[in-house]
Amino acid sequence: MVELMISAPASGSGKTVLACALLAALKDRGLDPCAFKCGPDYIDPMFHRSALGVDSHNLDLFLAGEDRVRGLYRRYGGGRGSIVAEGAMGFYDGLGGTTDRASAWHTAHTLDLPGLMAGRPKGASLTLAAQIRGLTAFRTPS
């Protein structure tokens, strides 16, 4: 069973494309995927549902809190063959852009999900290693 959080260093990095591709592959393999989106975003879950025919639900730590988000995750993801959660903005970008509260990192930490980073490597090489190291070392666990 696949359970993971797809995130990125910033918006526009390919999270939704990667999430949709992974959900389509899981569905094609008969793994009954369920999708989640961090925060109140309604557009990406619409892609998950309309384009792929995959159930998609929001996980909003700001509006629902940790206990309710855990309950929603179990309610909609329990018994599914695979779960793909998609972050919003950058991995650590939470409320107001000044905290990691309600971020993809906070959601992944709350649900004990491993992360998969999307990114645009154009025009960079060794700098990518520094960015990856920074993303993995900024908070514990990461």
Where are the regions that the model predicts?
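ATP-dependent carboxylate-amine ligase catalytic core
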Residues: 2-13, 17-111, 115-141
